[in-house]
């Protein structure tokens, strides 16, 4: 049997899932962390619950990838490298170059490198991952799958900002969005659950995790999305601020006497639930404190829910209603109270969450009441499987 590996390389990490094909069964998954630091950590899950863990230095992505592939052989997961016939790489920023997933060649790698200014923490690391796998698996069918491609064809009225048009022409100043692979996956599953073609549906997909984005989907395509030029925009997140008045950013930056880079760092890593609660970026910690009377945590949760509610409401207006609202990712999949709260506040639109159906974690399910006008669906995301599907589609076209 041939195997396909889906890869997500971060600035100091490599995460992967290995699939048997064509069954699409996951035979191994894991990650290597702290690449480039004094001591790294590798963890691989395989077989019937077996786990391999090791602490050792990984000076760069190349050594991490070589270790990973060697371990797949050492653990008996594959017998030889050439069993892995395809590699799919998740890439954060595809700009306006890439409106779909593509087979990787030298030109594609050059473009990914050029787009690094749009995602300086991600694209360079992802390019290192591509090169590392190409060195060890030179004959594997390699594909790049972009977080931004799903949103690249959204209407200009939603993609562009109300700033001088030449900023878009000269600098690519527009909304690129993120989590596109996740939104595509759950939208396709929603269509199957509803028994209708995706092209005939109006959906609002809510990827609510540490990073969070909400997308309005019309005729199977992204119509609008909450994240913007970067993944910092949109709803309140674990450590990210979401939408903030730019004047406030400039005002506080001046008061603190810090650089633009330091200000962006604060908005990315010290804001959101963490900044509001001054306690934790983890929703569970904030909820527990709120239940014990912590007023600041109560407020943080109210703001968090309200920002999600505002985006869903605006997208219901933009789409002229919806067939379904879909929840996915860490909070969306696992937090029944959050789903119930959002559903209850959308009752005016015909949304109704059934508390009994909603009493579930991480399981694909219609959690709406039988008489709901707009369905509420819980769909665990599977970005790696979406990458595998893109590989197979491009293989057939090759």
UniProtKB/Swiss-Prot annotation:
Keywords: ATP-binding, Cytoplasm, Kinase, Magnesium, Metal-binding, Nucleotide-binding, Transferase. GO terms for biological process: acetate metabolic process; acetyl-CoA biosynthetic process. Gene3D superfamilies: 3.30.420.40. It is found in: Cytoplasm. Pathway: Metabolic intermediate biosynthesis; acetyl-CoA biosynthesis; acetyl-CoA from acetate: step 1/2. Substrate binds at residue 90. The record marks 179, 240 as: Transition state stabilizer. The active site is at residue 147. GO terms for molecular function: acetate kinase activity; ATP binding; magnesium ion binding. ATP binds at residues 15, 207-211, 282-284, 330-334. CDD domains: ASKHA_NBD_AcK_PK. Mg(2+) binds at residues 8, 383. Mg(2+). Can also accept Mn(2+). Its cofactor is Mg(2+); Mn(2+). GO terms for cellular component: cytoplasm. Pfam families: Acetate_kinase. Homodimer. Belongs to the acetokinase family. Catalyzes the formation of acetyl phosphate from acetate and ATP. Can also catalyze the reverse reaction. This is Acetate kinase. It comes from Limosilactobacillus fermentum (strain NBRC 3956 / LMG 18251).
């Amino acid at each position: 049997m041939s195997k396909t590996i889906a890869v997500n390389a971060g600035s100091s990490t490599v995460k992967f899932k290995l699939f048997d094909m064509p069954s699409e069964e996951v035979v191994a998954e894991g990650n290597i962390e702290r690449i480039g630091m004094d001591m790294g950590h590798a963890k691989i899950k395989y077989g019937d619950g077996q786990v391999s863990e090791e602490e050792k230095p990984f000076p760069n992505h190349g050594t991490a990838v070589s270790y990973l592939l060697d371990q797949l052989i050492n653990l008996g997961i594959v017998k030889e490298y050439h069993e892995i016939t395809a590699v799919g790489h998740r890439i954060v920023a595809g700009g306006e170059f890439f409106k779909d997933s593509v087979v990787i060649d030298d030109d594609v790698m050059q473009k990914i490198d050029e787009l690094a200014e749009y995602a300086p923490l991600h694209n360079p690391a992802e390019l290192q991952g591509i090169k590392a796998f190409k060195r060890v698996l030179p004959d594997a069918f390699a594909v790049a799958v972009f977080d931004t491609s799903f949103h690249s064809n959204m209407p200009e009225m939603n993609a562009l900002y109300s700033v001088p048009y030449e900023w878009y022409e000269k600098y690519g100043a527009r909304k690129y969005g993120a989590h596109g692979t996740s939104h595509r996956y759950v939208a396709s599953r929603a269509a199957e659950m509803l028994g209708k073609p995706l092209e005939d549906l109006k959906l609002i997909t809510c990827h609510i995790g540490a990073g969070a984005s909400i997308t309005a989907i019309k005729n199977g395509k992204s119509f609008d999305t909450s994240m913007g030029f970067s993944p910092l925009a949109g709803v309140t997140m674990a450590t990210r601020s979401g939408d903030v008045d730019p004047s406030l950013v400039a005002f506080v930056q001046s008061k603190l006497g810090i650089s633009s880079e330091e200000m962006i760092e604060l908005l990315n890593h010290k804001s959101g639930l963490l900044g509001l609660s001054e306690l934790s970026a983890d929703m569970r910690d904030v909820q527990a404190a709120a239940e014990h009377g912590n007023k600041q945590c109560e407020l943080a949760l109210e703001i968090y829910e309200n920002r999600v509610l505002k985006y869903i409401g605006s997208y219901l207006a933009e789409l002229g209603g919806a067939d379904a609202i879909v929840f996915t990712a860490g909070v969306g999949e696992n937090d029944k109270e959050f789903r119930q709260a959002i559903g209850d506040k959308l009752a005016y639109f015909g949304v109704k969450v059934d508390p009994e159906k909603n009493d579930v974690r991480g399981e694909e399910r219609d959690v709406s009441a039988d008489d709901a006008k707009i369905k509420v669906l819980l769909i665990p995301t599977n970005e790696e499987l979406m990458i595998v599907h893109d590989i197979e589609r491009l293989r057939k076209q090759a």
